[in-house]
């Protein structure tokens, strides 16, 4: 197999910035990495670099939700021993576990397809445009009348299944989980928060699993050195922390249509570039 091309520092910085800025927004960070790397660097950053740089944004969401995580974990552990402590946070701990199962199973069995075939830009930009309709529909029909006390294990299953759609670059993890939450009648901020909590174990496992491949990719994609991966992770962390804080404030007063418009604009523009041969799909 031909050795993967090495990444320059400029590529690392740009792609890590794209990762950090878009990871928590419903616009697909993996899709943006594929688009940016193809347009500006004539190559694909690869699924492995994407997964490892996600460790930076993973750290960001863990820091942001640290108090929630400690509270939920504490309640879950106490609830396992004492029934009287089985409150909302105890149940939420179980919901995160339940909702994580689908993506762990699919990610394990279809990892090779995720790393290669579905990274074709035609697939990415089509998903970017098509799933915009799903987000718009969820925003339109969602009642947003249910709060955290009314969250159930069935909601966890549905949102967990929706999270598996994020395995396809261009869909968006937050876009799929927030949309699922809105379809279930959850309020917009709860849908986002639960989706972020659900992503923590999945993204962490994905990043660790892909760490060796980022140095020596087993499929198409550029390779990075240890220092480059460290810098990429730090950049993604700083920008990711800013992005998650901004998004949760934004969703309190604004709807998802802003992101729908952005996705359609970028996706349509990319379809034109692909159709005219200006940008190569692979």
From Swiss-Prot:
Compartment(s) of residence: Cell membrane
Highest taxon, organism lineage: Bacteria
Give the main location. membrane
Assigned keywords, A-Z: Antibiotic resistance, Cell membrane, Cell shape, Cell wall biogenesis/degradation, Hydrolase, Membrane, Peptidoglycan synthesis, Transmembrane, Transmembrane helix
Cellular component terms, GO, for this chain's entry?
plasma membrane
One GO MF annotation is:
undecaprenyl-diphosphatase activity
Which biological process terms from the Gene Ontology are attached to this UniProt entry?
cell wall organization; peptidoglycan biosynthetic process; peptidoglycan metabolic process; regulation of cell shape; response to antibiotic; response to nitrosative stress
According to the record, the segments passing through the membrane are 90-110, 121-141, 194-214, 228-248, 256-276
Identify the EC number(s).
3.6.1.27
Alphabetical list of Pfam families matching this protein:
BacA
Please give, as recorded in its UniProt entry, the membrane topology of this protein. Answer: Multi-pass membrane protein
Catalyses which reaction(s): di-trans,octa-cis-undecaprenyl diphosphate + H2O = di-trans,octa-cis-undecaprenyl phosphate + phosphate + H(+)
The function of this protein is:
Catalyzes the dephosphorylation of undecaprenyl diphosphate (UPP). Confers resistance to bacitracin.
The record's misc note reads: Bacitracin is thought to be involved in the inhibition of peptidoglycan synthesis by sequestering undecaprenyl diphosphate, thereby reducing the pool of lipid carrier available.
Q: Which family does it belong to?
A: Belongs to the UppP family.
Q: What is this protein called?
A: Undecaprenyl-diphosphatase
Q: Which gene encodes it?
A: uppP
